[in-house]
Design a protein with these regions (language model features):
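Generic helix-packing signal
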Residues: 1-2, 23, 54, 73
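Helix N-terminus capping/helix-initiation residues
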Residues: 8, 39, 105-106
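Active-site-lining helix/loop region of Rossmann-like oxidoreductase modules
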Residues: 55-59, 63-196
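Rossmann-fold NAD(P)-binding glycine/threonine-rich loop
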Residues: 13-20, 25, 34-56
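N-terminal glycine-/serine-/threonine-rich beta1-alpha1-beta2 phosphate-ribose binding loop
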Residues: 1-21, 153
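Short strand-turn motif at the edge of the Rossmann-like AdoMet-binding core
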Residues: 32-35, 61
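Residue-level marker of alpha-helix boundaries and capping positions
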Residues: 9-10, 37, 172
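A short hydrophobic/small-residue beta-strand
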Residues: 28-30
């Protein structure tokens, strides 16, 4: 059946396997498994393919907010961009009994080590135009996925904390992430663009 846009919401592997073919078919794509774009060569190839075919790659806000504001990192001096993500050990498949830092470093490295748990880090990096700093924590006391964003620069300071509830249809995904796709789809053709 004809369509204008394809939504990838399966996995990093699915995005890597199918995104280019979607773009070559002249269709826009919404990539939810943003970790696939941590591979600079793959990302550059997709962008060039989209350009050649006059189509777009859409990255939804996913499980966070403020990607529109983080984009100022592409044009203004930034002193700090840190994402601190805290998840329950069960969601990370780790038998951890006390709060433990599992990762500290750049987003592109975190995506390689934890490909199923760091789409937020890659989304923020894409918005900022650079690989951001990431801390990944496991905490048995946390029953939700929590993302804290610390963003400082010549524009001022931003702190945001998001505690996501799981999607009722897929507990591995946050409900906010699922809703962000629906919001993006609803507004694709709107003449009023907010937060771009």
């Amino acid at each position: 059946e004809p369509c204008d846009v394809i939504v990838e919401a399966a996995s990093v592997a699915a995005a890597r396997s199918h995104a280019k073919a979607v773009l070559e078919a002249g269709k826009d794509i919404i990539i939810m498994s943003v970790g696939a774009l941590a591979d600079e060569e793959f990302k550059a190839d997709l962008i060039e393919t989209a350009r050649k075919n006059s189509v777009k790659i859409h990255i939804p806000s996913g499980a966070v907010l403020g990607l529109d504001n983080i984009k100022v990192g592409q044009i203004a001096r930034v002193d700090k961009i840190l994402l601190k993500t805290t998840k329950s050990p069960a969601s990370l498949n780790r038998p951890i009994t006390e709060k433990t830092q599992l990762f500290g470093g750049k987003a592109h490295d975190c995506v390689r080590e934890f490909p199923k748990n760091t789409n937020v880090a890659q989304s923020l990096s894409l918005a900022a135009g650079r690989s951001i700093d990431v801390e990944l924590w496991a905490d048995p006391a946390e029953d939700r996925n929590m993302h804290e964003i610390f963003f400082e620069g010549e524009f001022g300071e931003i702190y945001a904390r998001i505690r996501n509830v799981p999607s009722p249809d897929n507990p591995a995904t946050s409900y906010l992430a699922a809703l962000s796709i629906l919001s993006l789809l609803r507004n694709l053709d709107s003449p009023l663009v907010i937060g771009a």
